[in-house]
Structures are given as structure tokens and as C-alpha cells.
Amino acid sequence: MHNGGERNANTRYTAGLRVLLSALIGLTVLRLAVLIASPLDLFVDEAQYWLWSTRPSFGYYSKPPFIAWLIAFTTALVGDAEWGVRLASPLLHAGTAGFVFLAGRSLYDARTGVAAAVVYLTLPAVSFSSLLISTDVPLLFFWSAALFSLIQARQHGGGWWGGLGLSLGLGLLSKYAMAFFLIGWLWGELSSPRASRRGALVALAIAGSLYAPNLVWNAAHGFISYQHTSENADLAGAHMNAGELLAFMASQIAMVGPGVFLGLMAALISRPLRDEPARWLIGFIAPVLVFYLALALVAGANANWAVSAYVAGSILAARGLMRASWRPAWGMAVGLNVLLGLAIAGAVLCWGEETDRFPLRADPLKRLRGWETLGAEVSQWRQRYPADCVLVTDRATASAMAYYALPRPAPVVKWHPPGPIRDHFDLTADLADVACPAWLLVAPPDRATGMARRFTGSEALGTVGQPQGDRRERRYAIYRLHEFAGYPTRSPSP
């Protein structure tokens, strides 16, 4: 009888692994295919990350450097087409699902691990994120690796502390939100102390050593990245806004899917009362959600800012759904998310190039279109009227033209009269210090004339348009300029 029970357990374990591998391989291949076929232009942030990848550094204005290193690696392998810039995204999400499986298996059992990994892999947020590249992608990968390493270190010690330190350090080099992991770790030690003090110090020392180059870079640049991160929170203009809070809560339901959200909420309410692993996992969920819920109430918060909560959240949600009194709960929740993921892929492929299907305000893809068209027109002007550098007025146009104005990377400088540094281009290039014999100005018509007057020679060439959707386009005036004479002395803008 005992051998029969073991055989049944092994059979269930093997079947579970087959389900997981099928989901991992099937969804990853599908996402890679959609990625390659996607008609979407690079989003402004993606184009900026690509530009960073051409200029290796230990830090950048708004983010730590790992995203740039990651893109440099993938584009070195497959080239710098849009899908090459985004290639790491579906692959790292698959890796994150693998670590979620390992963490769920270590805390509970293989069945829970498989269920949790499939929950993570099918989250609508992951389905959409797999078609883009962002700092959330490596953050989630290293967060999940750190979670698994911490579980193993608490259970077995030894070299797992080194793995924890490695994951923590690389996570901090991916996104500063990795610091929330330390709060979860502290929560776990207070609720269920098991850590070796020596092991914890080893992990922290490794993490600190890996992160140190970015700290040094920030010190050399006035801690500009930390300043930008704090400004993102916009606490200076804080005020109570219930509408922002409700919008953020709705966005979290959309991020994980309604079924998974209900499973997670049920688990958060009921399981910690009798489940030690659940109490421990809450440390990696609650602080993130509570912080951003509070921020949403007083200043607003982007939907993706709380995404790290859903690594541990996938495990807890899977556990809650599997233990639900209604047995099909897990399958229904995952099935709904699979349909949502397919809808996202279908929308990208079918509507990615259609700029007039939605009213402009309701178009979810409007910021991922039109840049290639603008870049092609600017490239033609550069060929007809040779110019060494492109001058623009804003970060979005600067990032997009660096990628889409050929040959890439186009030498782009942003108009920035003396004043606060607001972006990467303000930090890295001062128009007055850039030696360019000839410039191509790409600017809104109402600003271009005043800017052209600040050069000793200027020639109006024409206008170009960037499709915006809903039969609208943004117009840019094109000038050829020579010899910058300096910014206006009184007015901060032309």
C-alpha cells in the first residue's frame, strides 16, 4: 500500500510538471511569436533604455543600470529591431514562473508550486509585460529568485545565503523597488525567526557590494536617481483623492485578473490565521500594497508600481483557490486570465497599426505608434540636408528619434535652458557644449521659430507629422540650424 501511495504521488508530481512545462513552453513560444510579429513601435521608455544600452554605465538618470545591460545583451545577440530590444521580457517572465514554482513547492508542495507558477505566468499584467521591456521584468525575476533563495536559506543555510545576496543586489540594480524585499524579510524574521545572523550578514554584504557601483554613480551625479524616484511620488502636492485610490484598486484587479484577485483576497483574510507559510508570505505582499494604496490616496500611483507583490501573491492566491470550497475555482481563474492574455495578444496584432479604431483618449496603444513614421521622415530630411545632430524639445521625442532617426543611434540633444534637470537628456548633454556644425531642429511649430532665432543661421525646411490616432497627428516644424548663440537670458523657454 505504501509503495502504491508513493507511485501515485510520483505520478501526480510528474503530471504537474508536465502541465507547468507545457504552460511555460507554450506561452513563451506564443509570446515570442507575437513579439516578433508585433507592429508596435518602441514606447518612449523602451527607446530610452535602448539608448542607454549603447552607452554602458553604472547608472542613469531615472533607473539603475541593469535594464540597459540586459538590452545590450539581447541586441548583441539578435540585433536592435524592436523585438530584439524586448526579447528578454518573455524569457525572464518564464524564469520568474520557474522560481515561483520552486518557492511554492518549498513552502507547501509540488502541486501548489505548479498552480502558483501557472497563476503567475497567466496574469494579465505578465501577458502584457511580455510584449514590452521594462525595469519590472528583471525586478520580478530577481525578486522571485531572492524569495526562493531566502526560503532555502532559512531551511538549509549554507550557500543559499550567497544566492539571496546575489539576487538582492541584482534586483536593486534593476529597480529600487527591490528594497521592499528587505521589509518582507524583516517581517518574516519577526513573525517566524529562523535566519542565521551570519548568513544574513553574508547576504547583505554581497547585495551591498553588487549595488555599490550604482551608489557611487549616484553620489557623483548629485543622487539624481533617488531624487527622481522621490519626485515620482509627487508628495509635495499630496491631497486626499478617493477617486485615485479607487482607480488604483481597479487597476490591481485588472493586473491579476478578477478570479486571482478574489483568491488572493480570500487567502489574505483567512489563511494566515492557521497557516505559517501564508503569514510569512504576507510580508512580501502587504507592505507593497499598503504603501502604494496610501500613495494612490494622497498623490496617485501607477498600476505597475505594486507588481512585486504578485510574486508571493501568486503562491498565496493559488493556495487559496486550490483550497476553495468550489473546486473549479483555480481552473476558472486561470482560464479567464488565459483568455485575457489571448485578447491582449490579439489586440496587439490586429489593432497595433490601426490608428483610427478608437477615440484618441480611449486608445490603449496610442503611445506605441507613430514614432517610426516620424523617425522615417526625419531621416529623409537628414539625408537631404545633412545635419550632425538633431535638436528636440522633450524627452519623448528625444528618446524616439535616437532610435528611429537613422542611422541609429541618432545624436539627439534636448533644448534645455538653465534650470532643474528633469530627464536623461538634461543630465547628459548641454546644447551649449555640443560641437555640431549643423543641426536639424524637430520641434512644435509654436516653439520652433523662437528656438531658431537662437542660432546664427537658420533655414525653415518644412513640417512633418506623427500619427496620433482618431485621424489626428502631431505636427513638427523642421529647420536646419548653424552655430548656437546661447539660450535666452531671461525667458526659460523660447
Question: Predicted regions: what is each one?
Answer:
Residues 87-107, 145:
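Transmembrane-helix motifs of polytopic, lipid-linked glycan transferases
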Residues 181-277, 284, 288-293, 299:
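Transmembrane-lumen/periplasm boundary regions of multi-pass, lipid-linked membrane glycan transferases
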Residues 24-27, 116-124, 168, 172:
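Short helix- or helix-capping micro-motifs
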Residues 8-10, 105-111, 146-161, 266-273:
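Membrane-interface transmembrane helices that cradle and orient dolichyl/undecaprenyl
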Residues 125-139:
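Short acidic/glycine- and proline-prone juxtamembrane loop motifs at membrane-interface regions
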Residues 303, 327-386, 395-411, 416-423, ...:
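Membrane-proximal, lumen/periplasm-facing interface regions of secretory-pathway glyco-
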Residues 2-4, 10, 18, 100-122, ...:
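Transmembrane-helix signature of polytopic, membrane-embedded enzymes
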Residues 99, 119, 138-155, 163-167, ...:
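Specific aromatic-rich, kink-prone transmembrane helix
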